Amino acid sequence: MSTISVLITALALSMDAMSLSIYQGIASTESQKKQNFLKIVLTFGIFQFAMALVGSLSGILFIHYISLYSKYVSFAIFLFLGLMMLKEALKKEEMEYDEKYLDFKTLIIMGIATSLDALLVGLTFSILPFYQTFLYTVEIGVITAIIAGLGFILGDKFGNILGQKSHFLGAALLIFISINILL
């Protein structure tokens, strides 16, 4: 696999993380932006790297089981997050960002939900020498972190421009992605 192929793969893998990052950029208050930006970038970058590496190390032993359920788990999580965001957007009063929303448990769930596909991609690396696998998985993690950061910034800008309507946009985006996962 060439470096260009890994770059394109990493960009494709990072789209789920970008979607959630956009939402976090929209939802975060001014006082939470820097902290949430770091949480998002690190969580998505580390999880994409780690899951791709775990996938490559586990080889073909578990590919059947992982491939059976990964899209359904991702669908359920994205749909749940989208519906939760839609429910909040439908409230009449101005929404307040819940600082507990990005607690450790939530970050873990989001990290897993966005990196199940990286686990499967990692399985394709299992035939490569370890040093090459490691470099490719690091590349995937770094690119995902960058894309997640850009998504957060984009969400922040949209949130400032659109106000509360941006929550409808974020909800629609998450629900669309959940449906797209099943197709």
UniProtKB/Swiss-Prot annotation:
Cysteine pairs bridged by disulfides in the record: none
> What does the entry give for GO biological process?
intracellular manganese ion homeostasis; manganese ion export across plasma membrane
Where primarily located? membrane
Mark the transmembrane ranges: 3-23, 43-63, 66-86, 107-127, 134-154, 161-181
Q: How does it sit in the membrane?
A: Multi-pass membrane protein
List where in the cell it is found: Cell inner membrane
Provide the GO MF annotations for this entry. Answer: manganese ion transmembrane transporter activity
Q: Which InterPro entries match?
A: Mntp/YtaF, Put_MntP
Q: Does the keyword Cell inner membrane apply?
A: yes
Report the HAMAP family cross-referenced here. MntP_pump
Function in brief: Probably functions as a manganese efflux pump.
Query: What is the protein's given name?
Result: Putative manganese efflux pump MntP
The encoding gene is mntP
